[in-house]
């Protein structure tokens, strides 16, 4: 039987968070992600991982407090479900998702939802996997789709109006980012240095609050690029 661990205030400092394990260049990002998780646990944030060294985890929380430009009542939102490498094909993804579904039902939720894409994109779940468990498309913006598994007849979640804009007024290259991903901090610092060395103007906008996340001008999980005002 597989052994899983849910991160808590008591164990998070000793546990790894699956991504960037042992990678010193991403340590600052790992530390930021851990602090972010600590701040979110009070909201019901769940980070559940296989007790192993690898990228094998699910991360979700109530949609009302999730840093994503999606709104809905009494739903859980899955940020990420990742099973990588040799752990694939062993039913671990199934166990992680079923845990989240059952946990949501036990909490009296109306359903659970997640972001996918019609086309394969990095760091976004596979649509077919979720559809196998009964998730259905409830809203769409371009190639991006909001999937939901309903437990009752209540209204399904929707993308916020701000996310439907998919554009900004600033015409310079602009990056929106958040501490939700441990890889982000290193990449931002690298881009800042690259921009300085090559005299390129890049605007960096940090999403560091629930309000900013809910009002993001595009589909936003933890990173978004704009150029000449258009979402890339």
Which functions belong to the PLM regions below?
Residues 65-78, 88:
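A conserved beta-turn-beta hairpin within the catalytic core of GNAT-like acetyltransferases
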Residues 7, 142-165:
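C-terminal "cap" of GNAT-fold acetyltransferases
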Residues 104-120:
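Conserved GNAT acetyl-CoA-binding A-motif
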Residues 1-51, 162, 181-183, 187-190, ...:
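Short amphipathic alpha-helix that is part of the acyltransferase structural core
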Residues 115, 131-148:
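Conserved catalytic-core motifs of GNAT/GCN5-like acyltransferases
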Residues 83, 89-104:
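Conserved acetyl-CoA-binding loop-helix of GNAT-fold acetyltransferases
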